[in-house]
Amino acid sequence: MRIPEDVRKDIPLTQEVIYFDNTATSLTPKPVIEAMDEYYLRYRANVHRGVHRLSQMATQKYEESRKVVADFINAEFDEIAFTKNTSESLNLVALGLEHLFKKGDKIVTTPYEHHSNLLPWQRLAKKKGLKLEFIEGDDEGNLDLADAEKKIKGAKLVAVQHVSNALGVIHEVEELGKMVKEEGAIFVVDAAQSVGHMEVDVKKLKADFLAFSGHKGPMGPTGIGVLYINKEFFDVFEPPLIGGGTIEDVELCCYKLTEPPERFEAGTPNIGGAIGLAAGIKYIEKIGIDKIEKQERKLVKRTTEGLDELEIPWYGPRNLDKHAGVVSFNVPPLHPHDVASVLDEHKIMVRSGHHCALPVMKRLKINGTVRASFHVYNSLEEVETFLGVLEELVKSLRSSQ
């Protein structure tokens, strides 16, 4: 498969716009849409406990999708629970482990987290009287691993992002995982910005819980997320949601939960979403995760070089080996929304604002950034067009000063 030409053929929108908003959501290739269409047109039915042929087919495809997801991140089949998105997955972890914490216990995270990997721990700390500590780092988002080792000592739980959605920094999650396991703490990984962009192996990361969304890196639909639950926690993690599908037996006085993964999926799941996610992962595997990572690195390199040439400030690690396909920048004195509007006039889609990472913006003393984020279907030609628009904008601003 030629990168990115053959991928672009499967995504008609790439012929109409320059789409640099992949951190928010990726575009959807035809095979994903076709897989979901097949479900809705040929075997639309609810899963589990149905004896008719449509339900049997839907159940088979749904569970096959779980296997595809599990294999992709090197997990076991029953360690995968489908959710709505990363945010829900992380909230479920905090709620399901709440009973393990007592007053004075320590949770450790970083100051660079997406709100979805910060607020659940803030709420839990407030509710249970816990200590919430943050691993120190610099303005590029690089963590101080010596400080991490100190902070992790005595921690009950450590929750970190794999890749920053605001700065693009790739954290040393594998190294952090070793520290956490040496301490005997629980390790939670927010992999929303890494799955589908780089290799993610739950065993290498030593993750106890790992969360991601289908609509980002994996190029699946919205409304489907994943929560990996290490089987060592099956009897410890209390499902926050129970009801239909989660039980083995019910009396008027009490109930008995069924085995995982069904016990973690209350009610009718997003069947079409799971099937679409699996199709997206198969598409990613067909391309090759190494080729995706290589293409994104090329795009980041040229983008940051171009911004430097234009003397436009950008944020994140200068060491591009630690920089994922996310480049945040500003064009002073313009507000990020104004820059994004100018780019939109040229059919270039970027994100602007605080990116659900207000502590990061406050640390940098800015009200937000413009964020260009890439996937395998983006091209160097698109980057040059993007830089050309910024060059004209900068010239206009500087000539009027």
From Swiss-Prot:
Q: Which reaction does it catalyse?
A: (sulfur carrier)-H + L-cysteine = (sulfur carrier)-SH + L-alanine
Q: What class of enzyme is it?
A: transferase
The alphabetized list of GO BP terms reads: cysteine metabolic process
Q: Which InterPro entries match?
A: Aminotrans_V_dom (IPR000192), Cys_dSase_SufS (IPR010970), Cysteine_dSase (IPR016454), PyrdxlP-dep_Trfase (IPR015424), PyrdxlP-dep_Trfase_major (IPR015421), PyrdxlP-dep_Trfase_small (IPR015422)
The GO terms describing molecular function are: cysteine desulfurase activity; pyridoxal phosphate binding
- What keywords are annotated for this sequence in UniProt? Pyridoxal phosphate, Transferase
Question: Could you confirm whether the keyword Transport appears in this record?
Answer: no
A Pfam family matched in the record? Aminotran_5
Q: What does the record give as cofactor? A: pyridoxal 5'-phosphate
- Sites bearing N6-(pyridoxal phosphate)lysine, chain numbering: K216
Q: What is its EC number?
A: 2.8.1.7
* Family, as annotated: Belongs to the class-V pyridoxal-phosphate-dependent aminotransferase family. Csd subfamily.
What name is this protein filed under?
Probable cysteine desulfurase
**What gene makes this protein?**
csd
